[in-house]
């Protein structure tokens, strides 16, 4: 396997890792992103975790195949559990998990706040839950990028704890800084968000006879983003 062949999603996540000394890849799956980060010079060392034994072993085998096992530590654990004493982590990367799960992993790891760890997050779904958690718990979103892969669209989020909470609405939770993104992937992402909200609005109209202004405003703003792309 060529380490470069990791797909557009993981490449986008990797692009947000800057100056990584020790990068923790949570839910590392088969270790492809971890390997790429080391091989490309984006990480000096990797801590790879997974809750399942088989994918973690695949990651171990992949690093051995490339003769860089000395560049990584592997942990069979849930999220970041057991890593609180590892105070040299500079980045935590979480890709491919649901938004609620990502939020819970961050919540359960206070060292992220204490040590100024950079977060790189790419939820498989429910990105709104990730943004909401970050807004309400003092994390500042520093960058977001949209990315498409296999006809699905995602957002990659870079964030760091500052202690500053952010007032937010439906639009902020579902769009965030992606409103600054342009191109085909951005348009695909915005269209996905619009479809979901129009469906939600229709359901609310049927069930309650009305739709909250917050949602209708979000729909109109997203339509404008699509038109500009």
Walk through the language-model features, giving the residues of each.
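Conserved alpha-helix/loop element of class I SAM-dependent methyltransferases that forms part
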Residues: 4-20
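Conserved class I S-adenosyl-L-methionine
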Residues: 20-29
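Glycine-rich SAM-binding Motif I of class I
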Residues: 31, 35
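Conserved SAM-binding motif I beta-strand of class I
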Residues: 45-50
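Short SAM/SAH-binding signature in class I
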Residues: 88-96
């Amino acid at each position: 396997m060529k380490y470069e062949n990791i797909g557009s999603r993981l490449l986008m996540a990797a692009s947000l890792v800057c100056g990584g000394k020790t990068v923790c890849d949570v839910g590392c799956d088969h270790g492809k992103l971890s390997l790429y980060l080391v091989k490309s010079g984006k990480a000096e060392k990797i801590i790879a975790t997974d809750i399942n034994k088989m994918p973690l072993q695949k990651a171990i085998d992949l690093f051995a195949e490339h003769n860089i096992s000395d560049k990584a530590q592997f942990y069979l654990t849930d999220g970041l559990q057991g890593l609180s004493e590892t105070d040299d982590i500079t980045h935590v990367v979480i890709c491919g998990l649901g938004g609620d799960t990502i939020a819970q992993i961050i919540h359960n790891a206070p060292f992220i706040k204490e040590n100024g760890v950079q977060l790189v997050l790419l939820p498989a779904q429910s990105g709104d839950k990730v943004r909401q958690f970050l807004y309400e718990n003092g994390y500042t979103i520093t960058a977001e990028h949209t990315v498409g892969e296999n006809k699905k669209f995602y957002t990659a989020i870079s964030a760091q704890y500052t202690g500053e909470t952010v007032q937010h609405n439906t639009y902020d939770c579902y769009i965030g800084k992606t409103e600054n993104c342009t191109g085909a992937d951005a348009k695909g992402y915005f269209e996905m968000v619009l479809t979901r909200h129009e469906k939600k609005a229709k359901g609310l109209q049927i069930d309650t006879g009305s739709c909250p202004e917050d949602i209708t405003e979000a729909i109109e703003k997203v339509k404008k983003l699509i038109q500009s792309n």
